[in-house]
């Protein structure tokens, strides 16, 4: 049997028995599913020959070169601020954006140039429907000087022109910008206009494109019913708000009366009329931005390739000075970058979360405003270098700047307070009189005193200098509080004791004016015991001057006495007014043990200073000590024990159950809020409990 030999063999070892291949009609089918028949491949239809159905080329668009004359088409000009469109009769050249156009000349165009206005003014073929025909019904134009009657139904509220000053009339035929604005607004009028528009929701929003051409008509639409247009700026345009305000005033014709942050209040003018406003054609297409030069050069000017790479490498490790939020107000960004350049030559700004185009626009603005050199935009950060030509905006520091500044501060404070001490030159002049004759010494001292009076200076204490009298009196001697400062010539130099030549005790009184109108200072009999130094001449017996000068001198002397009062400071030292508080704190620190004072001998020994420092450090507290902590005021709560406190103690002694304790804790808050008379504890009254009967039974059991 031919089939028995085939079935006795295993299918797994068929390769060991080479046999001839069976015909197709005798083969066994090992699969339970039939294979599907192969589908014939379909042929693609031939591509149409019409160019409208051809495949779109997905490559970079070809750049259109700019001709040498800078006018690639009729009415289109290439300027230093991008593309500009010129129309006959227009007051200025139109642009898509008046504030966000880069300050660089384009290199090439991305599309064929054309005028982006309506079909009436553009040579571009119209690809859509024809414009609708004009309405046969002519609607009357809105006139700001002919307002609808108030209270008319279906009419929105409209503000009249103005405000007008008293005695002035409105100008109906105002042509120029100055005539439309009229007289400058007063401060009260500005405050009233801003306050009326501050909370209004009707506003014009300016975004990343800045002030566009079509916004000019939108502003006039706001001015149709309101005197002030509220403009809110966000994003890139807020980097240079001064440029935004300038372009608004130049292109629209209004006046910026107030701006804070990113909000601008634009006033239309006193004589504004919507009927005679300038009408500009609207842009129906947004023109493609031209090709500008690269913002970031691979090798910036003034750097070598290695230096540029090293700066970019250092910039990756540099922390950013700030992080810009999306649609934020970047009003102080330029100022922050300039201040950062004072400390480091590289500055990094974090722009993560912003659009890529916004980051580059901000970098281009900073490049022109700071100015600086852009190094990279990687990782959504702006890396800037201040450049080799950078100059600090701070004034140069010199060696004597600190001394000059301190002298100026001292002089200003002395002049403001009116209390200061005598300069050293006055003392030196007084002590050097013995080397000069009487007349020359009198002239020198008189000149020095006059100069000190003019500069607002007064005589101070000089105990160690002979011939100078202290305004407060010398040690152990009391002087009159009202006596002016002068020298006593009662005794001659021959009668002076050598021990008395170092001090001078004097008192004086003022008499009436003489015939010449001069005030003469005389001395009473009680000055007979006072001694005079030979350094003081007899010609200085009187000091002549007007009564106003004497009164001013007396006032300054009293202020000096108040300055050198009992504040722990030596009276013969020159102490400025601004040092009083410091010296007082120093004295308090020594008295309280918070400061340690060493003399010259102790300070010279380093080991002694170290030992004293260690011992003084150990006396300080380890933790922070707050001496003036605010105390919590509990109102009129009394400190004596309340009734509920006694009940809680009684419950704790008897070990009350948990639910009873929880109830007492919950009700404790309400008990504390009772009146004071309910909290008072009376000894002759039995306290009433708040427990229920079953709980009392458990406790008594």
Curated annotation (Swiss-Prot):
Cellular component GO terms, alphabetical: chloroplast stroma; ribonucleoprotein complex
Domain CRM: residue ranges: 183-279, 301-397
UniProt keyword annotation of Chloroplast present: yes
Major subcellular site: plastid
SMART domains membership: CRS1_YhbY
Subcellular location: Plastid, Chloroplast stroma
Location of the transit peptide in the chain: 1-77
Chain spans, region CRS2 binding: 581-603
Pfam families recorded: CRS1_YhbY
Keyword presence, Plastid: yes
GO biological process, one term: mRNA processing
Main function: Required for the splicing of group IIB introns in chloroplasts. Forms splicing particles with CRS2. Interacts with RNA and confers intron specificity of the splicing particles.
Subunit description: Interacts with CRS2 and RNA. Part of large ribonucleo-protein complexes that include group IIB introns, CRS2 and CAF1.
Name recorded for this polypeptide: CRS2-associated factor 1, chloroplastic
Organism: Oryza sativa subsp. japonica (Rice)
